[in-house]
Curated annotation (Swiss-Prot):
A GO molecular-function descriptor: metal ion binding
Keywords associated with the record: Acetylation, Isomerase, Magnesium, Metal-binding, Mitochondrion, Transit peptide
Residue numbers of N6-succinyllysine PTMs: 202
Stated family: Belongs to the FAH family.
Native source species: Rattus norvegicus
Free-text cofactor note: Requires a divalent metal cation for activity.
Designated gene of the protein: Fahd2a
Disulphide bonds in the chain: none
Protein name as annotated: Oxaloacetate tautomerase Fahd2a, mitochondrial
InterPro entries hit by this protein: FAH, Fumarylacetoacetase-like_C, Fumarylacetoacetase_C_sf
Record PTM N6-acetyllysine, positions in chain: 202, 233
A Pfam family matched in the record: FAA_hydrolase
Gene3D superfamilies (alphabetical): Fumarylacetoacetase-like, C-terminal domain (3.90.850.10)
UniProt binding sites for Mg(2+): 159, 161, 190
Length: 313
């Protein structure tokens, strides 16, 4: 028999699938598995909640990982555009296992205190420069995978974030040129062990990078699909209750400024992921603080990008 948490997750997924499929104006790139495939493939999600076009079946010469796909640049994207225009048969969503849209990137870069309203809830000043930290790529899991509570932490918290995916190698990128280096956007959950985040001189890495602490997906939405990435509703629900609700227009440093800043220090590569910060409503600043527990279900949703749903185990 299914446990209550598993039943709730399946129920939520069915509700998402029953929503009207939002027409795909452009590309929603995914990595997926299916029973008839021997290995993961790259595909196109046919709108939020829709089925999947198998790009590797459409063109067997295409790479089967998103990082390699992005490394091909315009050559790979042009194939995807042709597949989109061809209105190919879809693999039903019920037959697909969605992976994170990007796995094993060279870097996962994160930004702290990057929402004005998040700074307000902590009663701290808006940073003068971006606060940068990282997660290891081993923390990445798919949009519907479980979040594993580590026995080492008693204070695991939620953070919905918009993630930017790099599409082209670059260093010392000017803010005015940044979007030429961006492939697109996706939904991220910056799961955070607050007790470990505050230890070791407040070096955040250990508290941010436990296995399964970076669910991503469901799709890499190409930049030309989004009219304005800095004016999107962003929210998080825990067991159906809204705990975070804001808009990406509250970001202190926009995508262009963040990437220009980071690229002063490191070379960015195709597939690199930049989490752009979280809005207010995280558990640690509630009175009393609230943290995730086994059986909880977390939904992170961003307008036009989609929703990821992760059970806590």
């Amino acid at each position: 028999m299914l446990g209550s948490g598993r039943r709730r997750l399946l129920s939520t997924l069915l509700q998402v699938q029953k929503r009207p499929c939002q027409p795909c104006r452009n590309m929603r790139l995914v990595q997926f598995q299916a029973p008839h495939l021997e290995e993961p493939h790259v595909g196109l999600e046919s709108g939020i909640g829709g089925g999947v076009v198998d790009l590797n079946t459409f063109d067997p010469a295409l790479p089967k990982t998103m990082v390699q796909f992005l490394e091909r640049g315009e050559t790979a994207l042009s194939v995807a555009r042709r597949a989109l225009a061809a209105q190919l048969p879809l693999i039903p969503r019920s037959q697909v296992t969605f992976l994170a849209p990007v796995t094993r990137p060279d870097k996962v870069i994160c930004v702290g205190l990057n929402y004005a309203d998040h700074c307000q809830e902590q009663n701290v000043r808006v940073p003068k420069n971006p606060i940068i930290f990282s997660k290891f790529s081993s923390s990445i899991v798919g949009p519907y995978d479980s979040i594993i509570l580590p026995p080492e932490s008693k204070e695991v918290d939620w953070e919905v974030e918009m993630a930017v995916v790099i599409g082209k190698k670059g260093k010392h990128i000017k803010a005015t040129d940044v979007m030429a280096y961006v492939a697109g956007f996706t939904v991220a959950h910056d799961v955070s062990a607050r007790d470990w985040q505050m230890r070791n001189g407040k070096q955040w890495l250990l508290g941010k990078t436990f296995d399964t602490f970076c669910p991503l997906g469901p799709a890499l939405v190409t930049k030309d699909t989004i009219a304005d990435p800095h004016n999107l509703k962003i929210s998080c629900r825990v067991n159906g209750e809204i705990v975070q609700s804001s808009n990406t227009n509250q970001m202190v440093f926009k995508t262009e400024d963040l990437i220009a800043w980071v690229s002063q220090f490191v070379t960015l590569y195709p597939g690199d992921i930049l989490l752009t910060g979280t809005p207010p409503g995280v558990g640690m600043f509630r009175k009393p603080p609230v943290f995730l527990k086994k059986g909880d279900e977390v939904q992170c949703e961003i307008e036009e990008l989609g929703v990821i749903i992760n059970k806590v185990v």
